[in-house]
Each structure stands twice: as C-alpha cells, then as structure tokens.
Amino acid sequence: MTISEELFSRAQQHIPGGVNSPVRAFRGVGGAPVFFSKGEGAYLYDEDGKRYIDYVGSWGPMILGHAHPDVRQALERQLANGLGFGAPTRIEIDMAEKVCELVPSIEMVRMVNSGTEATMSAIRLARGFTGRDKIVKFEGCYHGHADSLLVKAGSGALTLGIPDSPGVPASVAEHTLTLTYNDAIMVREVFARHGDEIAAIIVEPVAGNMNCIPPEPGFLETLRAVCDEHGSLLIFDEVMTGFRVALGGAQQVYGVKPDLTTLGKVIGAGLPVGAFGGRRDVMSHIAPLGPVYQAGTLSGNPLAMACGLTMLNKISEPGFYDALAAKTEALAKGLQERAQAAGVPLTINQVGGMFGFFFSEEKKVSRFEQVTRCDLERFRKFYHGMLDKGVYLAPSAYEAGFVSAAHSDEDIQATLDAASSLFASM
C-alpha cells in the first residue's frame, strides 16, 4: 500500500469522501487519489517521493509554476507585516488598479475569496441592477456551487454524474434558464420569449468545466447582441480563463466586451481569492455605494493581494503569453500526431495555455452532448498509464489541462514520449 492510499483511508474517517472538493476523489478515473507534499516549478511530488510533470496547476492558477521565487518573496514580505487586518490596505488598491489596467472592460472591481463568491455576487448584482430575476447559463458550464448556478453544471458535478444538486430549492432553480453552449439560435429563441425577465447571461467564454470547449464564431457576439437588445447584462466567468488564455483574458482573445467579469485562480497565485468587476454604473450598485449587499471578512486579504499583484506583474512581461501558447500548442499538436499515428481517435482543443483532449471519433468537439459521448473507459486507462509514467493530468475527462511558464521543452517531450507508448498499446 502506498502512503497516498494510507492517507486516503485515514481521510475518509473524518472528511466526507476523503477530500475537500469532490473531483479530487478520483471517482472519474477510479483508484485512490494521489496525495502531494511539495510543488516546485512544473513538478509535483507525492507523499511517496515520486515526481510528476503537472498539467493541473492547482486547477489553473499556477501559471508561473509552483513556488515561484518572486511569489514566495512577496508572501514572505507580507507575512512579516501581518496576515490580515479586516481593514483597507494600500496593496488592495494597487491590485484593483492593476486588474482595471489589464482588463479594459473592468472599471471598478471588488475583491472576494473564491470564484464561487465572485459569480454568486455578480448574479446578485445583475438582478439588483436590472430588477429582474431570471438568469441564463449553459449546460456543462460550472460557475461555482451557489444554488442558482448548480443547474446542469459542469466540473466536479459532471464528473460525479450529479449536475443538479439536492438542496437547491425549486423556487431558486426555476429562475435559471439552461441553454446549449455554442447554440446561438437557441439563445435568440429564449430571449424572444423571456427577454424582459432576464437579468443576465453568465457564460464561460471558453468552457473549461466540460474539458476545454472554445466558443464557435459568432456565439459570444450573439450573447452581447441579445443582452444589448433586451437590457440584460452579459457576465463573463473568467475565473478559469482570466489571465490564463491571454493577458486580458478570453474577452481579449475574442474581442467581446462583457458588462461584468468574474475572476479567480491566477489573480491569487494559488492563494484563495476571487474578484468581480465591470462597468462603473453597474458596480456602483454594490454596498456601500448602492443597495446590493456584498461583504467578506477576508476579502482583499493582504497575503493574496501581495502574491496576486506579483503574479500579474510577472505575466505582464513582453512575450510571456506567446511563449506559453507556443508550449501548449507543441503539446497539443504532439498528442494529436502521436494518437493519429497509433490509430487512436483523439480530438484536441487549445486556447492559449489551456488545452483539452477527447477520445472521440468526432473531428470537432464543440457541444456538451459531444463531450458526454467521449470514451470514458479509454480516458481512464490513459490517465492511469500517464500517472504511472510520472505525468499528472486532471483526474476527470471533463476537466481542462494547463501548461505553465515553468514547463520546459524537455517536460513537453517527456510527456509526449509517455503518451506515445500508451497510444501504441491502446
């Protein structure tokens, strides 16, 4: 028995399912989860001392790699001055100014402690600003575990086969209209019927919680258009894509400007953090300026602000995203070529430093129903084979992968070599 297996057995005695977030339980791939003790650069080390090339990156935020020296120094400097004050600080202003500088659609921003808090608060704000109740979301998109957003959700909910959760009142769920991602016609039809009741559309501009699904041409533009036509707000959930697919997020890549944006992951450099921001007139409805209440004891905590600001300064350096995209493209193309050579049907999607692969006969995977038809058993075999060879991928066929600046050409090649030997045996 490995140390990870022993720890998992212990964990199940006092932690529900042995984990503090469901997808970590390996239900999507089988077996016991790996327990890690250290991260450094592009690598993770488990409790048995085995090293892995990491393509999870703490589910996205480790864009510089684990334990980057500059981030560690920023954390240590702030630790010397205190962990938190529950009061305003200079560094939260610096952070807000930097976010608004890098994401032009954000004129004002409010810091929170998680992506779920960010999306929950953005929805409340949209409802308060418009005076409407209904929201539109998309099947397979995950926006955290707030009640109104746990309807046909992606991520861990999809992995466990429970995209609708008990405990969500029908009276809450009835205000959530769930449509098909990348179906612009359906969006227009729903707005034709309910447009004057809809407060907002919330969407992952690149759907990263049913693996990695980019928007089809015209889809995001349609969302912008119908919101303008009906007085609804467009919310981009960029918790995953923000500062990950480009410096200005997916809205920069696709040239569509939302009214509100939610952020998380990268902006905390691995520490718990979230944010939501957007148009000044909308954000002015948040207390204490306006009547929509939102608060948090640890919001804007100086540890996360110090690390996040350091992270944003590093990724703002010239050429950072070109290099990151080139590495990710080399990995994606390499996987595709090796699978094809072995006769294994594989479809790859990639946007910037984010990628996803599907064991599927379909040449293009762009809809939720296509994702659910992929070969899960083949994914499980591939996953455990790569794990044995020292490559750590997301333990679910419905989660995206991430490349960091710390991944070297040698890391990419080692990953491709491991995949090639597995494809040959499949």
UniProtKB/Swiss-Prot annotation:
Q: Where in the cell is it found?
A: Cytoplasm
**Record's keyword annotation contains Cytoplasm:** yes
What the entry lists under PANTHER family is as follows: GLUTAMATE-1-SEMIALDEHYDE 2,1-AMINOMUTASE, GLUTAMATE-1-SEMIALDEHYDE 2,1-AMINOMUTASE 1, CHLOROPLASTIC-RELATED
Q: Which NCBIfam families match?
A: hemL (TIGR00713), PRK00062.1 (NF000818)
> Which Gene3D superfamilies does the record cross-reference, listed alphabetically?
Aspartate Aminotransferase, domain 1, Type I PLP-dependent aspartate aminotransferase-like (Major domain)
Q: Tell me which UniProt keywords the record has, alphabetically.
A: Cytoplasm, Isomerase, Porphyrin biosynthesis, Pyridoxal phosphate
Chief subcellular site? cytoplasm
Q: How does it assemble?
A: Homodimer.
Entry protein name = Glutamate-1-semialdehyde 2,1-aminomutase
| Keyword Ribonucleoprotein among UniProt keywords | no
Q: Name one GO molecular function term.
A: transaminase activity
What cofactor does this chain's UniProt record say it requires? pyridoxal 5'-phosphate
| EC number of this enzyme | 5.4.3.8
Q: Which SUPFAM superfamilies match?
A: PLP-dependent transferases
The alphabetized list of GO BP terms reads:
protoporphyrinogen IX biosynthetic process
| Xref: CDD domains | OAT_like
Quote the cellular component terms of the Gene Ontology held in the record: cytoplasm
Tell me which residues bear N6-(pyridoxal phosphate)lysine: K265
Q: Which family does it belong to?
A: Belongs to the class-III pyridoxal-phosphate-dependent aminotransferase family. HemL subfamily.
Highest taxon of the lineage: Bacteria
Please state the pathway this protein functions in, per its UniProt record. Answer: Porphyrin-containing compound metabolism; protoporphyrin-IX biosynthesis; 5-aminolevulinate from L-glutamyl-tRNA(Glu): step 2/2
Q: Which gene encodes it?
A: hemL
Q: Kindly state which reaction or reactions the protein catalyses.
A: (S)-4-amino-5-oxopentanoate = 5-aminolevulinate
